[in-house]
């Protein structure tokens, strides 16, 4: 595959879960150290690198596969949960109202040796298109620092910088962001 070619994108399947989980952890361990110290990286790998199977079950999670390996993953949700890693709440599974609430961009990860090749952007484009087709007019996400540049380049605006408390008490700096969906 040439440097400018993207590996194909497809919907994630339940059988992909082990490979996706491994990619999430590997991506965190490779990319987070440039932004966070070791304690934060290990906590993020443990709690943020946890796959929410509802994304796959809902048909809103995508992967790019190259040579039989999943090299990028990400998706969106019509459910209330904004990110994995904060523990769960009763309201996480609530379906969002597309007329008044933003769809959630979730669990975006790219393998370290596949960054800067347009895979994250391709997943965001798919998320936006599919969410807009279901009536959503806005996308929201909680960015970790390694992903902030991608989201800004895609047109997400910062709502606020915040500290995300993980279940072990570690507080990880994040950025709440939103952008309008292009009309479908």
Q: What are the residue ranges of the model-derived segments?
A:
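Conserved GNAT-fold acetyl-CoA-binding loop/helix
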Residues: 28-50
